[in-house]
A protein has these predicted regions:
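Carbohydrate-associated surface elements
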Residues: 41, 168, 189
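Short alpha-helical donor nucleotide-sugar binding micro-motif in glycosyltransferases
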Residues: 156, 275-276, 283-289
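Aromatic "clamp/platform" in nucleotide-sugar-dependent glycosyltransferases that forms part
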Residues: 297
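Short hydrophobic beta-strand element within catalytic cores of glycosyltransferases
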Residues: 314-317
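A short, well-ordered alpha-helix in the C-terminal region of glycosyltransferases
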Residues: 350, 357-372, 381
């Protein structure tokens, strides 16, 4: 089947959606589908940054053809990325089906217009975030309400199939007025990371003196990082050797995080590592962390939690979005309310002081939770959806 995947960004741009699309594209290509990825030249949107010139704008990666089109956007809270020439690129691909990712983006409207004219089915993976969880102030939130009601809802209605990653995501879409077409529940999968080099440790490489709490993800406003800092402070007083390690590209919050670190007097107790491209070092960080924390305001799924669990690391995560559908509270980790620094502290102290608990939760996550989520299973389900919407 001739398939086109349309995400806003694609690796080496960091992010969960980016990895998601890469994993399904490479596996679909391995199954002899003709796969193209039409994406932008963006490394990140907030702050706006393009990929370096060394990243080819047209190439073949893992059997999938990747074209990176020029992106542009309005400034500030009017931010809304556009693909330059996406309609023409779709026409040139002559696809049998288009799979577009992230509902609140211009590529959905362009894909719908192309699909209408070419009589081609299209499916949408929403990667939905409710209005209250997105970055920006009141103007951006008002614009998002207008977009959802007047523009996005009619677009979603016309998709041949809407793919959600959790039942909670489906519920939120319905609650926010989206007239859903056929819906398929397809949670993402986990792909084993490259193992660390023998004899190399994350702590030694970066000079981290003792046990550490780990966060991996974009430094963005919806990730709950300020409550994490506040919740970590009592642990740092309880254990003077404890460090909080934050790995991830700046999503607009780094300056605020640095200010809050200073206000809380945490200084060298928090390490801002930025984005680490070497997967082996990130794998080592997951492996060595005493606990992984994802205190987000919202996550459609929370793929990074699977990565932590796969390394046998217990997790603390917000009881939001799709997270409670796969992280069992008290079995693989602890679920807490979002935006609750005291709950972060309580969960950290519970896990920090109990090696047997860490071992038990880590073992359950690695041996019981993670095997339920594989990318091959995801692609099996996608192929079923694709065949049904394309028809005989």
């Amino acid at each position: 089947m001739q398939l086109v995947q349309v995400p806003t960004r694609y690796p080496p741009a960091p992010g969960g959606v980016e990895r998601h699309v890469q994993e399904i594209a490479r596996r679909l290509a391995k199954r002899q589908h003709r796969v193209s990825v039409l994406t932008t030249d963006l490394y990140r949107e907030i702050p706006w940054e393009r990929l370096p010139p060394s990243v080819p704008r047209s190439t073949t990666e893992d059997g999938a053809r990747v074209r990176r089109l020029r992106a542009f956007s309005f400034p500030g809270e009017l931010h809304y990325p556009f693909f330059r020439g996406l309609g023409r690129a779709l026409k040139a691909e002559s696809p049998e089906l288009v799979h577009v990712h992230t509902y609140g983006t211009n590529q959905v409207a362009v894909t719908r217009r192309f699909a209408r004219r070419a009589h081609v089915p299209w499916v949408l993976t929403a990667h939905y975030h409710p209005i209250w969880s997105i970055w920006g102030g009141s103007l951006r939130h008002r614009l998002r309400r207008f977009y959802d009601a007047r523009l996005a809802a009619p677009l979603v209605r016309e998709a041949s199939c809407l793919i959600v990653q959790s039942r909670e995501e489906e519920r939120l879409l319905k609650e926010n007025g989206f007239p859903l077409p056929r819906v398929a529940l397809i949670p993402p999968g986990y792909s084993p990371m490259r193992a660390p080099d023998p004899g190399t440790t994350f702590a030694q490489t970066f000079g981290i003196p003792g046990p550490f709490v780990l966060f991996v993800g974009r430094l963005a406003s919806n990730k709950g990082l300020l409550p994490l800092l506040e919740g970590f402070r009592p642990l740092s007083q309880h254990d003077p050797t404890a460090t909080l390690v934050l790995i991830g590209a700046d999503g607009g919050m780094r300056a605020a995080i640095e200010r809050r670190i200073g206000e809380l007097g945490l200084g060298s107790r928090v390490r801002l590592m930025g984005y680490i491209e070497d997967e082996r070092l990130v794998s080592a960080a997951f492996q060595e962390a005493r606990v992984f924390v994802l205190p987000s305001e919202y996550e459609a799924f929370g793929l990074v939690l699977l990565e932590a669990l796969a390394h046998g690391t217990p997790v603390i995560a917000s009881r939001v979005g799709g997270i409670p559908e796969f992280v069992e509270d008290g079995r693989a980790g602890r679920l807490i309310p979002p935006e609750d620094a005291a709950a972060v502290t309580s969960a950290l102290l519970e896990i920090w002081n109990d090696p047997a608990l860490r071992e038990r939760w880590g073992h359950y996550g690695r041996e019981t939770t993670v095997p339920r989520y594989t990318w091959d299973r995801v692609v099996d389900q996608l192929e079923t959806v694709y065949r049904e919407v394309v028809g005989p």
